[in-house]
Amino acid sequence: MRSSERGCAPVSMCGALISRSEPYILSMTLVMMTSLAMARERERGTLESLLATPVRPLEVMIGKLAPYVGVGVVQVTLFLVMARLLFDVPMAGGWDALVVGVMLFIVGSLALGFFLSTLAQTQMQAMQMSIFYILPSMLLSGFLFPFRGMPDWAQALGSLIPVTHFLRIVRGALLKGVGLADAWPSVMALAAFVVVVTALAIVRYRTTLD
């Protein structure tokens, strides 16, 4: 049975909607989940116990975020399987670009959540900061409105948001079969975001420990 017979017609519209939804849902869950988890540890005082250990900030960050990388991979896999089986979304290819984009986006989202947790003193503050990031991502990334139809200043701000570039990778890979070579600008933008946010998170976490 085609997806148009299941309440999502036409198929191309359904595929476009689902491909736009994945980056936003993934960002929302990973950023908020990480920031809340780390803020909860701060409230409980478990982070202070790391002061007595020789573990470096980068090692702490990797240890804390590694399990959530697996959560993100499982989430993306389930999303793609459901999109194909339930809505018959076409999978045009471009798997190399999709895999690289997914991993960069997951790591970047988790690093951002970690960074926000170093700024927050409570779980409530962590949640508010996460929402403050998520809402502009929804409005400026092309999720709700066509990116090229937005004003120049909105496009400039949207280009700084990782969801924008991940959305292009997912949409291009699933609907058009765009490979890694053609998706290189968006991949490099995500990689730059990962490097910058990870560095900020490490510096901020080191300052917190000091």
List where the protein language model places each region.
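Hydrophobic alpha-helical transmembrane segments of polytopic membrane proteins
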Residues: 98-120, 138-141, 192-199
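Alpha-helical transmembrane segments of compact multi-pass small-molecule transporters, enriched
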Residues: 74, 78, 104, 132, ...
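Generic alpha-helical secondary structure signal
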Residues: 17, 76, 135, 165-169
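Transmembrane helix segments
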Residues: 120-164
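Transmembrane helix-boundary elements of multi-pass transport/secretion proteins
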Residues: 1-78, 82-98, 119, 125-128, ...
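Short amphipathic alpha-helical coupling elements at transmembrane boundaries
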Residues: 48-52, 121, 155, 159, ...
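Short, membrane-exposed interhelical loops at transmembrane-helix boundaries
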Residues: 164-178
